[in-house]
């Protein structure tokens, strides 16, 4: 049974959200709004809301963050970044296995250095943004490997195909606190996927199969 202190905290959070709703757009006050409508399991949303309640939720700040990829080709190294994405990270800095991360990317916001390359990557041979407008990552395991390093396991959904991935993560406090007490953090995460696993099986003689995914995101503790 929920103790009284926990109940009062949830009531206070609800009052705060209702007050903010009168001053800001609905999407800004609903911390899980980008992930509703069946995008993720309701239990994951509950975890994020509980983390907000407990003070363990960090929201990604899009303007000061980067989400992208790089892949080698016969001609050059192809690098791309996504301009539109939302998400958050919920974790207890002193416990393993209690974290949850969700990131939703607008595939059509992809930006590369050249229009021809960008059109190719957005096209049906690769991201096929017309039919698959979003890329989704949801985690199912977070394990600290050091004071500021961790492993993040989860599922990546790309082109309608979901596969497990493992990110190597480094966290840095962006204030005068340690990571565990920080109000704002920098999270860098990388992993490598095989594009063929996600249905990108064309142009294999031109573009490598291995694609590195990378994130460098600033995240602000919810309520700060």
Residue ranges and their predicted role:
Residues 3-12:
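Bacterial N-terminal signal peptides that target proteins for export
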Residues 19-21:
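N-terminal signal peptide c-region/cleavage motif recognized by signal peptidases
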Residues 25-224:
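Low-complexity, acidic/polar, glycine-enriched regions of mature
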């Amino acid at each position: 049974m929920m103790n009284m202190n926990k109940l009062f905290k949830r009531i206070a959070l609800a009052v705060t959200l209702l007050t903010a709703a009168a001053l800001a757009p609905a999407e800004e006050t609903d911390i899980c709004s980008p992930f509703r409508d069946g995008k993720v399991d309701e239990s994951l949303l509950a975890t994020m809301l509980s983390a907000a309640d407990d003070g363990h939720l960090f929201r990604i700040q899009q303007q000061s963050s980067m989400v992208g990829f790089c892949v080698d080709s016969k001609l050059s190294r192809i690098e791309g970044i996504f301009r539109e994405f939302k998400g958050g990270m919920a974790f207890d800095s002193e416990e393993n296995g209690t974290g949850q991360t969700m990131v939703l990317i607008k595939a059509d916001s992809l930006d590369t250095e050249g229009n021809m390359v960008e059109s190719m990557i957005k096209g049906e041979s690769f991201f096929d943004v017309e039919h698959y407008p979003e890329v989704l990552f949801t985690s199912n395991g977070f394990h600290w490997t050091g004071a500021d390093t961790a492993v993040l396991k989860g599922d990546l959904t790309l082109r309608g195909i979901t596969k497990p991935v493992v990110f190597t993560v480094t966290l840095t406090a962006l204030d005068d606190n340690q990571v565990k007490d920080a109000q704002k953090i920098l999270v860098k995460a990388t992993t490598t996927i095989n594009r063929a696993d996600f249905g990108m099986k064309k142009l294999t003689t031109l573009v490598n199969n291995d694609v590195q995914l990378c994130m460098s995101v600033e995240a602000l503790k919810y309520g700060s």
